[in-house]
Structures are given as structure tokens and as C-alpha cells.
Amino acid sequence: FFSMIPKIATGIASLVKNL
């Protein structure tokens, strides 16, 4: 589970950058 956190955080960060 914790191994997925970095991937999710990176995905959210990329979405925020696109905004």
C-alpha cells in the first residue's frame, strides 16, 4: 500500500502542474 503513495502523489502533482 505504502509503495503506491509516491505514485499517487506524483500523479496529483502532475495534475496540479497542468492546471
Curated annotation (Swiss-Prot):
Positions of modified residues (Leucine amide): 19
GO cellular component: extracellular region
GO BP: defense response to bacterium; defense response to fungus; innate immune response; killing of cells of another organism
Tissue specificity remark: Expressed by the skin glands.
Keywords of this entry: Amidation, Amphibian defense peptide, Antibiotic, Antimicrobial, Cytolysis, Fungicide, Hemolysis, Immunity, Innate immunity, Pharmaceutical, Secreted
Record's subcellular location: Secreted
Keyword Secreted attached: yes
Predominant place of localization: secreted
UniProt PTM comment: Phylloseptin-3.1TR is amidated, whereas Phylloseptin-3.3TR is the name given to the non-amidated form.
Family label: Belongs to the frog skin active peptide (FSAP) family. Phylloseptin subfamily.
Functional summary from the UniProt entry: The amidated Phylloseptin-3.1TR has weak antimicrobial activity against Gram-negative bacterium E.coli ATCC 25922 (MIC=100 uM), Gram-positive bacterium S.epidermidis ATCC 12228 (MIC=12.5 uM) and against fungus C.albicans ATCC 24433 (MIC=25 uM). Has an anti-inflammatory effect, since it inhibits the production of the pro-inflammatory cytokines TNF-alpha, and induces the production of the anti-inflammatory cytokine IL-10. Has an activity of stimulation of insulin release, which may protect the species from being eaten by predators by causing fatal hypoglycemia.
Name of the protein described by the UniProt record: Phylloseptin-3.1TR
Organism: Phyllomedusa trinitatis
